[in-house]
Amino acid sequence: MAAKVFESIGKFGLALAVAGGVVNSALYNVDAGHRAVIFDRFRGVQDIVVGEGTHFLIPWVQKPIIFDCRSRPRNVPVITGSKDLQNVNITLRILFRPVASQLPRIFTSIGEDYDERVLPSITTEILKSVVARFDAGELITQRELVSRQVSDDLTERAATFGLILDDVSLTHLTFGKEFTEAVEAKQVAQQEAERARFVVEKAEQQKKAAIISAEGDSKAAELIANSLATAGDGLIELRKLEAAEDIAYQLSRSRNITYLPAGQSVLLQLPQ
């Protein structure tokens, strides 16, 4: 009797395990920010997109393919040529995501690794097309315009593959060694020219200052000569007295004691 009970329990447990396995294989989860495409072994890829949550499928007949529909970044480096045939190294940062409603078409025509297959190809195509419209110098001075044109053209091109580009930006822009050296040489030449112009302007200012000073000295000498011709020795004696007065004032303010001989003027040869 006991053996039959244990046998019944064993069969029930086995049936329960099989049923649990079947139920478990018939369930699948779609996480937040993801979508699922169903592949049917008899009918192929279903033209439906499954949203977030837990869902049922037919075990061994249907298979879910999960896609991440959140925005993801990708850097794409490209080497191309400018309008004046300069080599340009550009790195483009792209923030992309698939159009959820087009996931069945994306999976059928491109595959799960759609970003690896599509983004490098169309980025190279668009960058070569846009950069070829600008000279190397314009790529630097008009970088915002270049970035905007690349973004517009690339967004339109990606839409044909069912991709949305939330952001496109130029993160790296360098040129070949020859162009870089030429730019550095030009900057050095401009600095030398500015320095030479400053030296010339300084010399001109010094020359003008010297001319003004000489004219002032000449005018002063002329005025003194006229005064001497008019006043004679009286003007000279007046200037001596003014100088003596100034010297005496300075000596009176000094802490040192100065002794003067009686009856003589040692400051200036003034008349007695």
UniProtKB/Swiss-Prot annotation:
CDD domains: SPFH_prohibitin (cd03401). Residues 177-211 form a coiled coil. The modification N6-succinyllysine is found at K202. The keyword Mitochondrion applies. Keywords: Acetylation, Cell membrane, Coiled coil, Cytoplasm, DNA synthesis, Host-virus interaction, Membrane, Mitochondrion, Mitochondrion inner membrane, Nucleus, Phosphoprotein, Proto-oncogene. The modification N6-acetyllysine is found at K128, K186, K202. The modification Phosphotyrosine is found at Y249. Induction: Expression increases approximately 3-fold upon entry into G1 phase compared with other phases of the cell cycle. Also induced following inhibition of mitochondrial protein synthesis by thiamphenicol. The keyword Plastid does not apply. GO terms for biological process: antiviral innate immune response; B cell activation; cellular response to interleukin-6; DNA biosynthetic process; epigenetic regulation of gene expression; mitochondrion organization; modulation by host of viral RNA genome replication; negative regulation of androgen receptor signaling pathway. Its main location: mitochondrion. The modification N-acetylalanine is found at A2. Signal peptide: none annotated. GO terms for molecular function: complement component C3a binding; complement component C3b binding; enzyme binding; histone deacetylase binding; protein heterodimerization activity; proteinase activated receptor binding; transcription corepressor activity. It is found in: Mitochondrion inner membrane; Nucleus; Cytoplasm; Cell membrane. The modification Phosphothreonine is found at T91. Widely expressed in different tissues. Belongs to the prohibitin family. This is Prohibitin 1.
